[in-house]
Amino acid sequence: MSLADAEPVFYDEAALTLQDHDHGEERWVIMGADAKGRILVVAYTYRDPNFVRIISTRLASKNERRQYLEV
């Protein structure tokens, strides 16, 4: 997955966003559709109010896809 794959997820109006409390820094996880219609899970953090640093991007699991589609 590339940065280009992850960017559309942030514009998906149906995206699900949760805070990830398992790390020392404030991290977030967003699940949404990319430009190809794939459901991706993107972990990220804010470096300042206008800068998002993507930590990882991956395809959603079967259970995660189901969760996204149910909302």
Predicted features along the sequence, with ranges:
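Ribonuclease/tRNase effector modules and their secretory precursors
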Residues: 1-71
